């Protein structure tokens, strides 16, 4: 007898003109800036709103303004985090499984279509190395493998052997 809420992704409001503006999302009448990058965040933010609306229905005092403010200020370091280093654009992402790698690759394909990507990557020993590498790597990409300090890291040479089998 548990209630079920089916959540559809938030809709991106398309604004013609400056492509560098932060996208605005709309879900259940709430308009809010997409603070986290990636199309998958349309689903994640909609789930957060749906959860908060259930709490509102149960009497919690959470205003729509507070929801919008919270969504506009959310940060997730290491998840599609843009930066600069010595004049080079960086994208830092801790994609640690195939689903996260799929979201990362979708963002890369949308943001940098047809551009070769230089990857600096390390993986934990316990992760699906072949699944992650097969998901993110494309023909023409460059891969630099490193151990992850302070963790049980996969051997970079073993990862390189896997990467060499990917078409």
Q: What are these language model-derived features?
A:
Residues 7-9, 83, 146:
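Conserved beta-strand termini and adjacent loop/short-helix elements that scaffold enzyme active sites
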